[in-house]
Amino acid sequence: MAIVSKSKEKNKIIRPADFRTTLFNMPKIDLHRHLEGSLRLSTLAEIARQHGVDLPSLSLEELRPYVQVVDDPPDFLVFLAKFKLLRRFYSSREAVERIAYEAVADAAADNVRYLELRFSPVA
């Protein structure tokens, strides 16, 4: 299957292998990104070590299901439960600054040109 693009190059065919690259290269806007959900696993483990936050594991792959929706059923309460652990990492000004900086850097790496980043410290 090919996808027809209605761009400057009239009816250009985009092959499936190139489609992912095409989407990645498109400039994007993100109007609703949560800082709590933008925490890198490696940063999470490092902040835990620095601030003595207990984690179920320090292995990034073992930690992933505790903070990301991986194989869980699509359930809103399961989704919200991930934030309980994530909120423990916003424990200092330096930690919040680092997490915010990395969230913006990650968005830029995804070719996001406009980002609305939100944070609810007490929810």
Predicted feature descriptions by range:
Residues 2-123:
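Metal-cofactor-binding active-site regions of metalloenzymes
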